[in-house]
């Protein structure tokens, strides 16, 4: 992480994950390939489970919203057991399509999170963090800062990454997690929602990310919204 001085008003630090706490290569070269290589096997093994069916329902709803997009992949409903295999293949194709566009829909992230959970628990995956992340977080905590994670990955996926990391269980060092259910990172309202949720004034929050486009920079010019909450630190 880049060395920097935390502005005086800041009491809370909001951390992005990909490229900030965790190498981008871990997501691109480990997590995403795991989904592509194992999704069909996972669906076949868990198809009858309630959680899996809820994931499919959410993906179907998302597919309906995406029907206007060029090249979208529909997910039909299985009318009979004989059609289950076709439906599973449709889900696989839809997930592949969404991932090819680097989409971050809540439905996709939910299914991915459940797949990663299984892999973390069985030891197939270990969450990666940069070597300076844990020392930095410990130092910030000693200085009295509150620490939260805000990422496009689901809260469950975040907890798995930090709970089963190469540095051990890091969840005790974090005060909470936020994902796209509060809004996307490019939307100013998302940061207001987070501030309201943790009962903290926006000017007391510092958002650290390596991706400038994730920050609604136009807000800097708006006196009604403080710069601190959208400040980024390149890592």
Curated annotation (Swiss-Prot):
Secretion signal, residue range per the UniProt entry: none
GO biological process, one term: L-methionine salvage from methylthioadenosine
Gene3D superfamilies recorded: 1.10.720.60, HAD superfamily/HAD-like
Pathway: Amino-acid biosynthesis; L-methionine biosynthesis via salvage pathway; L-methionine from S-methyl-5-thio-alpha-D-ribose 1-phosphate: step 3/6; Amino-acid biosynthesis; L-methionine biosynthesis via salvage pathway; L-methionine from S-methyl-5-thio-alpha-D-ribose 1-phosphate: step 4/6
A molecular function (GO) term: acireductone synthase activity
Principal location class: cytoplasm
Names of the cofactor(s): Mg(2+)
Cofactor note text: Binds 1 Mg(2+) ion per subunit.
Residues that hold substrate according to the record: 151-152, 185
The reaction(s) this protein catalyses: 5-methylsulfanyl-2,3-dioxopentyl phosphate + H2O = 1,2-dihydroxy-5-(methylsulfanyl)pent-1-en-3-one + phosphate
SUPFAM superfamilies: HAD-like (SSF56784)
Binding annotation for Mg(2+): 16, 18, 210
Keyword line: Amino-acid biosynthesis, Cytoplasm, Hydrolase, Magnesium, Metal-binding, Methionine biosynthesis, Nucleus
Listed InterPro entries: Enolase-ppase_E1, ENOPH1_eukaryotes, HAD-like_sf, HAD_sf
Subunit: Monomer.
UniProt-recorded name of the protein: Enolase-phosphatase E1
Species the sequence originates in: Xenopus laevis (African clawed frog)
Source species taxonomy: Eukaryota, Metazoa, Chordata, Craniata, Vertebrata
